[in-house]
């Protein structure tokens, strides 16, 4: 809170696969200064679509804070389908958006076409942010933006303004880096990239380990060629 000093909204991650524990946190912890919470679809225990709905129902009823849903089946093991997302969005007014990282453009488009007016779709995948904005998404919660906040946010702003030609140029500039970030997993990828740029040490806690040297050198080569300003 002190670092951002009101310049940007604070989105706090409050999620997990224990609904009761999340509700307890929301009802008893101090959320002063928090603008909204980001809550991931329950992971590992693979609930049904009805279970996902009931999970978010309990969360929405436990707080007045705005809630951003987070669908990332590649990490959680279960996909929240469009109809479930839309049902939650319609039933709970404090559910204001979804960070969609399913990689399924058809599913995302279905949400965008049928969502309530007070509900936004946010990309959770850098590589499809540009096409998703052309369909009606409002932005991105980004990985590569940690390394290139200025240039990547410029792409987003151009796309939101309808300047697709210039936005696409930036999208293509980053294309290989989008892939390299996840070759050896993330956050190892973005930490390696930031290390190449001289911004941080390349240290991780187990079970995460640094990227392979081949990935690291590939990043160095592309960054040298692109000469992109952070």
Residue ranges and their predicted role:
Residues 1-77, 87:
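Active-site beta->alpha loop and helix N-cap motifs at the rims of alpha/beta catalytic domains
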Residues 11, 28, 134-137, 141-230:
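C-terminal alpha-helical cap/extension of soluble enzyme domains
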Residues 20, 24, 54, 83, ...:
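Short, contiguous clusters of charged residues that form electrostatic/catalytic patches at enzyme active sites
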Residues 61-62, 75-178, 182:
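Catalytic alpha/beta core domains of metabolic enzymes, predominantly
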Residues 71-72, 94-95, 205-206:
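Glycine-rich phosphate-binding "P-loop"
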